[in-house]
Curated annotation (Swiss-Prot):
Binding residues for Mg(2+) 2: N598
Binding site for Na(+): D202, F602, N605
Bound cofactor: record note: Binds 2 magnesium ions per monomer. Binds 1 sodium ion per monomer.
Assigned protein family: Belongs to the glycosyl hydrolase 2 family.
Catalytic residues of the enzyme: E462 (proton donor), E538 (nucleophile)
Species annotation: Klebsiella pneumoniae
Listed name of the protein: Beta-galactosidase
Residues of the site described as Transition state stabilizer: H358, H392
Organism lineage: Bacteria, Pseudomonadati, Pseudomonadota, Gammaproteobacteria, Enterobacterales
Class in the EC hierarchy, top level: hydrolase
A single MF term (Gene Ontology): magnesium ion binding
Binding site residues for substrate: N103, D202, E462, E538, Y539, A540, H541, N605, W1000
């Protein structure tokens, strides 16, 4: 044990938090989570251990601007003005200090290993009693599962130790410091340490004791470490469970270790051996180690599809069977290897349907509870994810147990990121920082290697590539050859990775950055000598209204076997709840706490909102990742299973044929598909519709029974096909009265029955409509070529750093947002059966014509207004965001009904998950409440829209809400939006894609640009 004077002054003078060579003092060696059962049956059934005690709850707390401001007296007694906080928590979530959101830029001046003298410091204290029996024999430990960023610990006024690395446990032996009766802990937590330079992840920077704190009593002679591994014969019919056990304490001849393997109540195998390891070298082996190997016939294999778990119980006992201590862990029999360029699980090539996940809660910051963890896993499984990357640090220990149980493949990532360094590998190539990096990697492996869900180790994130990475790669491969190692830094394909794991590489487009080119994923596979699998560690940046082009990735993944999927960035929006002056909650992002530097809303890239409500993009991910694929030939549906191990046993295929959303025929067929197999389903003769319309066949795969992760009736996959249909023939209608045209100096007015249309002759716009005496418009109907910018449109552009390449800056510079209409023509003609209004507008900015819009409005005797629009786009202006019409309707109706793609928001490059049907939703559901307001709520492929007394027919896209594009563009947070009078309707003939390969460069694929130069669309507007 390292000895140090107990006084606070001496500790402060040492400044351990500014020494990369000091990562801990007196911290115990890493190991898997322990419970120290004294009853093997309790270990087998994973009952709460009587030897473990939680210290979570209310602690006394005092905050200081720097450690030097902490009074020495605090070591002995609580300060008179100390507050009470809950542990675990981040102190910023309790009003102390401010959370800081920054992506790349360090939140402190970069001068490693030194940190600011103004270093916020939290002083925690707790009094507690210890059971007398714990003091008589054995060792009492205290375990801090996570403290950010560094801390010193005192017990009863005596200094115990020091720890850093905020995402792994720090465990100390308290035995020598405890006494009978009341004991007092004092924990001084520093916000910044030299470790902060290794923790530059894209997340909120918070502080405090934010994971569990507990006491554990172990016997003097104890199990100090154990790890398990599984090995197989060629066909996986026989396995060996290898258990390596290490003890601490007096090494006696009578000591034995028994390892027993259980499947529920059944013991599958057992073995007993004395200590004494295998011969290592000419000096012998480890006297305190023993390795046992248990043979298992026909093991039930673990996978994310079928997460079969056994239970291994490790007993330390005497030769006569007297139990000293038991530890245990769940065991999954599975094998991970790379062979012939493929990542294999149990001999089958994986397709990673992955997502990156930060530990984030909108109310609790970085504190994770079991309910939130389970909620995340259930949502992932329900949306066809099978893998999660712990970005960018080891997670709460419980997370891995839950992933074992529910079935998720895990990339376990070391808590290392130096993104803000110039160059990025400034620390990772420096041998002085190797000890700190080594502890972060080796301790992660030692804690988590018993989990079957962990199939890949990661050396960290965005830290360049340095010699320290190479050393740690070799250490992992030596200690744990059963798992591949991945690391993206330095180009994603260095010698420190078994997997090509780029971030944001595109499907077909090279990004030839200097030193670290980012090739297209297809090209990467064909580079000379490259034989590794490619799995994107990050792709499809889901920031706000995003995930356009996602289907293109999945087409490539299914086409090229060595493209084995990737991890979407990312799972959850990292917004935090704040409260206004009236106590109302609102969602905050970077800068909202006065935090500088900050990266604004870049913390919100999730497929789900912070409260876990899904973004519409999540449905697109679910559909593209679905485990059943379909094809149609005639009346035969071919169903292909992409499950590798699971035979379908809880799936029904529901099919339905509908004409314009009206069902004509339906049925259901049980699915009986072998892993990676096919099933042909012959549909009956389908009825021929008597009328014209769109005829669609839709199939859904439904789970009739509940599972551990889904309710009964869960839909796991779906597909639609448009079928051959009758031609639409419009027969001459019976004669109607001809609308009456009247002309004044200012207007053309058309009147028919109780309806009137008014066109302003000066503007050329439809300025008003009446039904009876009720006005229908609050603003004229006019062309629209812009949208409230998406995050993907903005990129990295901001007021202090304009990116001229961003779409929004190109549109602004060209004048798209400022363009004004110059009327070139406005005429009215009475035809034999209708009135025809013709207008021509030139949309101009600073004397330049950007768009020319020619429109005709034909109002016939039935009261229908047929609008025909032809738009020419100037060749020297950026491709517009949309080509359409907009107006503010006077009505606010409760519901919206449409025939088209839905029900969720969809865009031209994100619509494969949308189905054609007749949909009916509340008006409020047509708006997507992105925290940073933007264009939202579009529905594509629309043939008919009904709202209030109005109906629109044609082939168009629309969104409808209480918020104008102008308000969305000018508002920084969704809670600041106010419902406007009436309803804003946007009807687009054409809409640009939204992109999503990344959010900092233009990422809309060329096929989704509005680049044609001239556009034509038609619309029929009538009243019901």
């Amino acid at each position: 044990m390292t000895m140090i004077t107990d006084s606070l002054a001496v500790v402060l003078q040492r400044r351990d938090w500014e020494n990369p060579g000091v990562t801990q003092l007196n911290r115990l060696a890493a190991h898997p989570p322990f419970a120290s059962w004294r009853n093997s049956e309790e270990a087998r059934t994973d009952r709460p251990s009587q030897e473990s005690r939680s210290l979570n709850g209310e602690w006394r707390f005092a905050w200081f601007p720097a450690p030097e401001a902490v009074p020495e007296s605090w070591l002995e007694r609580d300060l008179p003005d100390a507050d009470t906080v809950i542990v675990p928590s981040n102190w910023q979530m309790h009003g102390y200090d401010a959370p800081i959101y920054t992506n790349v830029t360090y939140p402190i001046a970069v001068n490693p290993p030194y940190v600011p003298t103004e270093n916020p410091t939290g002083c925690y204290s707790l009094t507690f009693n210890v059971d007398e029996s714990w003091l008589q024999e054995g060792q009492t430990r205290i375990i801090f599962d996570g403290v950010n960023s560094a801390f010193h610990l005192w017990c009863n006024g005596r200094w115990v130790g020091y720890g850093q690395d905020s995402r792994l446990p720090s465990e100390f032996d308290l035995s020598a410091f405890l006494h009978a009766g009341e004991n007092r802990l004092a924990v001084m937590v520093l916000r910044w340490s030299d470790g902060s330079y290794l923790e530059d992840q894209d997340m909120w920077r918070m502080s405090g004791i934010f994971r569990d704190v507990s006491l554990l009593h172990k016997p003097s002679t104890q199990i100090s470490d154990f790890h398990v591994a599984t090995h197989f014969n060629d066909d996986f019919s026989r396995a060996v469970l290898e258990a390596d056990v290490q003890m601490y304490g007096e090494l006696r001849d009578e000591l034995r270790v028994t390892v027993s393997l259980w499947q529920g109540e059944t013991q599958v195998a057992s073995g007993t051996a004395p200590f004494g390891g295998e011969i290592i070298d000419e000096r012998g082996g480890y006297a305190d180690h023993v390795t046992l190997r248990l043979n298992v016939e026909n093991p039930k294999l673990w996978s994310a599809e079928i997460p079969n778990l056994y239970r291994a119980v490790v007993e330390l006992h005497t030769a006569d069977g007297t139990l000293i201590e038991a530890e245990a862990c769940d065991v999954g029999f599975r094998e991970v290897r790379i062979e012939n360029g493929l990542l294999l699980l149990n001999g089958k090539p994986l397709l990673i349907r992955g997502v990156n996940r930060h530990e984030h809660h909108p109310l609790h910051g970085q504190v994770m509870d079991e309910q939130t963890m389970v909620q995340d896993i259930l949502l992932m499984k329900q949306n066809n994810f099978n893998a999660v990357r712990c970005s960018h640090y080891p997670n709460h220990p419980l997370w891995y147990t839950l992933c074992d149980h529910y079935g998720l493949y895990v990339v376990d990532e070391a808590n290392i990121e130096t993104h803000g360094m110039v160059p990025m590998n400034r620390l990772t190539d420096d041998p002085r920082w190797l000890p700190a990096m080594s502890e972060r990697v080796t301790r992660m492996v030692q804690r988590d290697r018993n989990h079957p869900s962990v199939i890949i180790w990661s050396l960290g994130n965005e830290s360049g590539h340095g010699a320290n990475h190479d050393a740690l790669y070799r250490w992992i491969k030596s200690v744990d050859p059963s798992r591949p190692v991945q690391y993206e830094g330095g180009g994603a394909d260095t010698f420190a990775t078994d997997i090509i794991c780029p971030m944001y590489a595109r499907v077909d487009e090279d990004q030839p950055f200097p030193a670290v080119p980012k090739w297209s994923i297809k090209k990467w596979l064909s580079l000379p000598g490259e034989t590794r699998p490619l799995i994107l560690c990050e792709y499809a940046h889901a920031m706000g209204n995003s995930l356009g082009g996602f289907a293109k990735y999945w087409q490539a993944f299914r086409q090229y076997p060595r493209l084995q999927g990737g991890f979407v960035w990312d799972w959850v929006d990292q917004s935090l709840i704040k409260y206004d002056e009236n106590g109302n909650p609102w969602s905050a992002y970077g800068g909202d706490f006065g935090d500088t530097p900050n990266d604004r809303q870049f913390c919100m890239n999730g497929l789900v909102f912070a409260d876990r409500t899904p973004h519409p993009a999540l449905t697109e991910a679910k559909h593209q990742q679905q485990f059943f694929q379909f094809s149609l030939s005639g009346r035969t549906i071919e169903v292909t299973s992409e499950d590798l191990f699971r035979h379908s046993d809880n799936e029904l295929l529901h099919w339905m044929v509908a004409l314009d959303g009206k069902p004509l025929a339906s049925g259901e067929v049980p699915l009986d598909v072998a892993p990676q197999g096919k099933q042909l389903i012959e549909l009956p003769e389908l009825p021929q519709p008597e009328s014209a319309g769109q005829l669609w066949l839709t199939v859904h795969v439904v789970q009739p029974n509940a599972t551990t992760w889904s309710a009964a009736g869960h839909i796991s996959a779906w597909q639609q096909w448009r079928l051959a249909e009758n031609l639409s023939v419009t027969l001459p209608s019976a004669p109607h009265a001809i609308p009456q045209l009247t002309t004044s100096e200012t207007d053309f007015c058309i009147e028919l029955d109780n309806k009137r249309w008014q066109f302003n002759r000066q503007s050329g716009f439809l300025s008003q409509m009446w039904i009876g005496d009720k006005k229908q418009l609050l603003t004229p109907l006019r062309d629209q070529f812009t949208r409230a910018p998406l995050d993907n449109d903005i990129g990295v552009s901001e007021a202090t750093r304009i990116d001229p390449n961003a779409w929004v800056e190109r549109w602004k510079a060209a004048g798209h947002y400022q363009a004004e209409a110059a009327l070139l023509q406005c005429t009215a003609d009475t035809l034999a059966d209708a009135v025809l209004i013709t207008t021509v507008h030139a949309w101009q900015h600073q004397g330049k014509t950007l768009f020319i819009s020619r429109k005709t409005y034909r109002i016939d005797g039935s009261g229908q207004m047929a609008i025909t629009v032809d738009v020419e786009v100037a060749s020297n202006t950026p491709h517009p965001a949309r080509i359409g019409l907009t107006c503010q309707l006077a009505q606010v109706a409760e519901r919206v009904n449409w025939l088209g793609l839905g029900p969720q928001e969809n865009y031209p490059d994100r619509l494969t998950a949308a189905c054609f049907d007749r949909w009916d939703l509340p008006l409020s559901d047509m708006y997507t409440p992105y925290v940073f307001p933007s264009e939202n709520g579009l529905r594509c492929g629309t043939r008919e829209l009904n709202y209030g007394p109005h109906q629109w027919r044609g082939d168009f896209q629309f969104n409808i809400s209480r918020y104008s594009q102008q308000q969305l563009m000018e508002t920084s947070h969704r809670h600041l939006l106010h419902a406007e009078e009436g309803t804003w309707l946007n009807i687009d003939g054409f809409h640009m894609g939204i992109g999503g390969d990344d959010s900092w460069s233009p990422s809309v694929s060329a096929e989704f640009h509005l680049s044609a130069g001239s556009y034509h669309y038609q619309l029929l507007w009538c009243q019901k």
